Curated annotation (Swiss-Prot):
Localisation: Host nucleus; Virion
Task performed by this protein: Self-assembles to form the virion icosahedral capsid.
GO cellular component: host cell nucleus; virion component
Keyword annotations of the record: Host nucleus, Virion
Transmembrane among keywords: no
Keyword Transport in record: no
Major localization class: host cell
Native organism: Avon-Heathcote Estuary associated kieseladnavirus
Domain of life: Viruses
Protein name: Capsid protein
Length: 369
């Protein structure tokens, strides 16, 4: 009798021990999961504040606007320099989907009468505007990335002077561009000097805006004004800032219809560009599809060495690295949706504080060393 009772007690003890161990394992797993979530949120916030941070391979905005999404960093890296006969080079950093940098008066601009050059992000699918024939006929513009929703997390630019010490003279200045831009500030054009507006070569860039900035003689009165020597460019980086306390996703359509009146001019033989009409809803719709206009832009003016085309006056050479961290959502019918990962949140109020902190330093250039 006593032996049977002991067996029952031992069995109960064993069950209690197993249950306790199981609970401890579950609690430990929950704690580990919470810790991993907290660490990932911290890393994602780090990328929000520093576009060149490598803290996470999934850059996202932890504001709870998505349960699952895909974050990635895309960039373009190359050498650029001022064009022959042009001692001033102009750069505009903007929050585009498949391109984020526009360079004017550069030696790399060798298409038609263009003075500008747009390097697109590596691996980007771009957009197709080959259907656009003239400024009077309606046409379709096609996005090729097949996103359902997308937004910029952060975007930035680093420049380094490549000239030797005896040729490192010159200086730079920069300002933030926060004024509201209009349709005429943006062009449908091609990246990487492509003569094919079809396929994945198309892009939208602020060509009209940089043309107006070129005529602005004095930048020093701007509140965000930053300046320095070309030899010290590696000590700073340039970043676009969000202009609101919240950041919504941009809904993407694979095909957008442009009425004939939405385009004011089309050139598909020399410069391969199309200009939008002021105030037209279709034009505004296309721009909003491929540019995250909730961010500002940064204009950089580089006062370079003289470039006469002959040694030793060959201008200034720069190493350019432009990165864009983006968060995208694919439709569940797209196979890329299987790569979605869980999206964490710190709450909209806490996220707004981080957005405000980003705008607190309004200098166009950010010291990094």
């Amino acid at each position: 009798m006593f032996t049977a009772l002991e067996k029952v007690v031992d069995t109960l003890r064993l069950r209690i021990f197993c249950f306790s161990a199981c609970c401890n394992e579950v609690n430990a797993s929950k704690k580990k999961g919470k810790k991993m979530s907290a660490n990932e949120i911290k890393n994602q916030l780090h990328v929000m504040h520093d576009p060149f941070s490598d803290k996470t391979s999934q850059p996202k905005i932890p504001d709870g606007k998505a349960n699952e999404s895909l974050g990635f960093a895309t960039q373009t890296v190359q050498e650029v320099g001022n064009a022959e006969g042009a001692n001033t080079m102009h750069i505009l950093l903007f929050p585009g989907q498949n391109s984020g940098i526009l360079i004017d008066e550069t030696a790399q601009a060798d298409l038609g009468s263009r003075t500008y050059y747009i390097p697109t992000f590596f691996g980007s699918n771009g957009l197709d505007w080959d259907d656009l024939a003239d400024a009077t006929t309606a046409a379709n513009v096609r996005g090729l990335d097949n996103y359902a929703l997308w937004r910029v997390v952060s975007t930035g630019l680093q420049l380094k002077l490549l000239n030797p010490v005896d040729q490192d003279d010159g200086w730079w200045e920069s300002v933030r561009v926060t004024t509201e831009n209009t349709n005429v500030d943006w062009y449908l054009t091609t990246g990487n000097n492509s003569t094919q507006p079809g396929g994945n070569n198309g892009t939208i860039a602020p060509v009209g805006l940089i043309n107006s900035l070129l005529s602005q003689q004095t930048l020093a009165n701007e509140q965000s004004y930053s300046t320095g020597l070309l030899r010290d460019l590696h000590r700073v980086q340039f970043e676009c800032h969000g202009q609101r306390d919240y950041h919504d996703f941009i809904q993407q359509r694979n095909e957008i219809r442009l009425a004939g009146a939405a385009i004011s001019a089309v050139d598909k033989t020399t410069n391969y560009e199309a200009q939008f009409s002021l105030g037209h809803d279709d034009a505004n719709d296309v721009i909003n599809q491929f540019v995250d206009r909730s961010y500002d832009m940064v204009y950089i003016r580089l006062h370079c060495r003289q470039n006469t085309g002959t040694t030793p006056f060959l201008g200034s050479r720069f190493h350019l690295n432009c990165v864009s961290n983006q968060e995208v959502i694919f439709d569940h019918e797209e196979r890329e949706s299987r790569f979605h990962t869980r999206s964490h949140t710190i709450g909209s109020n806490a996220n707004s504080v981080h957005m405000q902190a980003r705008r607190a330093d309004q200098n166009a250039a950010k010291m990094t060393m």
